[in-house]
Regions:
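Catalytic domains of carbohydrate-active enzymes, especially glycoside hydrolases
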Residues: 99-115
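N-terminal binding-site loop/beta-alpha segment at the start of enzyme catalytic domains
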Residues: 67, 73-95
């Protein structure tokens, strides 16, 4: 007999069945009360970090900050590479890259993300740090002087990150979330720059061959948690961190859609961190928009699908969207933000 039951049996004059029922009833009430308390605490935590437009918080970046939550921010993609999946070679020259950066600024970009190495699935191999630096630093240097918006450097290499920060970048966007080079965190912390940690699996050369994981939400949240802890251990302040679930990086089409659909779960787990989502022109959009013969839509015919997917992501809690088509994205999120603001402040 359990020692916990003896006092109940003595109280009831030695009638075990009745005492046992009383014991079960008391335990059930305790469980219900405890569950209610936990749920109230969870709701309170979520209410402390909502993502609807009329509540804001600050993302600290180098020499400044960006307001998160007031409206959705748009990050324009500027690839200075010969082989990116969507626009490789278009802006490889310094003059064309600068012109494109200015064009995105005029179209309403809040941030411009400069990348010097293609991360498309199946990419042949990494670019050396020296070559990548040579590609991005002149562009960052020129645009930081010409534009009044922050620049981000899209790199997984600490050497490139440091050089770009010295040239004027305020944010580091690491698609490996420190898996390839954890010294990226050191370079970011020392400069007080913003740090975007994106979930990915494998490398650009192998990610498309990896077997799918059973639970993609668990995989993403667990991996990002580990990267966040590593960044903080190396001196990165939490208020400088943004997370990205990594749509299209080592995921199946179904998993990409699942991540977008369940983005609010990521918000629940990381309520204080801004979320960036990049679906722009990704291959899963091309496959969904395939023609009758099954041929995927090419990158230049994926804009409308990209806008639909980013709209869904914003409605689920994305704070920043990373896009090729800046004007279309700016207009799309403006409408979404208006709808959400209206729903929070009905007439």
């Amino acid at each position: 007999m359990s020692e916990k039951l003896i006092p109940f049996f003595l109280e009831c004059g030695g009638l075990p069945p009745l005492c046992y029922l009383r014991y079960l009833a008391i335990q059930s009430v305790r469980v219900i009360v405890t569950t209610a308390v936990i749920k109230r605490r969870q709701v309170a935590a979520l209410q402390s970090f909502p993502y609807h437009p009329n509540m804001t918080r600050t993302w600290k970046i180098r020499d400044g900050a960006l307001t998160i939550g007031e409206r959705t921010l748009v990050m324009g993609i500027l690839n200075v590479t010969p082989d990116s999946f969507s626009d490789g070679g278009q802006f490889f020259s310094l003059e064309k890259a600068i012109d494109q950066g200015k064009r995105m600024f005029d179209e309403g970009a809040d941030i411009i993300d400069v990348g010097g190495e293609s991360t498309r699935p199946g990419n042949a191999g990494p670019v050396s740090a020296a070559e990548e630096t040579e590609r991005v630093v002149p562009v960052v240097e020129a645009l930081s002087k010409a534009l009044a918006i922050p620049l981000s450097i899209d790199t997984t290499k600490s050497e490139v990150a440091k050089a770009a920060i010295d040239a004027g970048a305020a944010i580091v966007n690491d698609v490996s979330a420190l898996r390839f080079d954890f010294y990226v965190a050191d370079a970011t912390a020392q400069a007080g720059a913003g740090l975007i940690l994106m979930h990915s699996r494998g490398t650009p050369a192998t990610m498309h061959r990896l077997p799918p994981v059973a639970d993609i939400m668990h995989e993403v949240t667990t991996s990002l948690s580990a990267s966040i802890k590593m960044a903080e251990r190396r001196g990165v302040k939490r208020e400088t961190i943004v997370i990205d679930p990594g749509i299209g990086f080592g995921k199946s089409q179904e998993q990409n859609l699942e991540l977008i659909e369940n983005l609010d779960q990521l918000r629940t787990i990381f309520p204080d961190l801004p979320i960036l989502v990049g679906t722009s022109r990704k291959s899963f959009i091309g496959r969904i928009l395939a023609d009758e013969a099954g041929n995927p839509a090419p990158p230049d015919r994926r804009m409308y699908g990209s806008m639909a997917s980013l709209a869904a992501a914003v409605m689920k809690g994305a704070n920043i969207v990373r896009v090729h088509d800046v004007r279309a994205a700016v207009e799309t999120v403006r409408i979404i933000d208006a709808i959400r603001t209206n729903s929070q402040n009905p007439a």
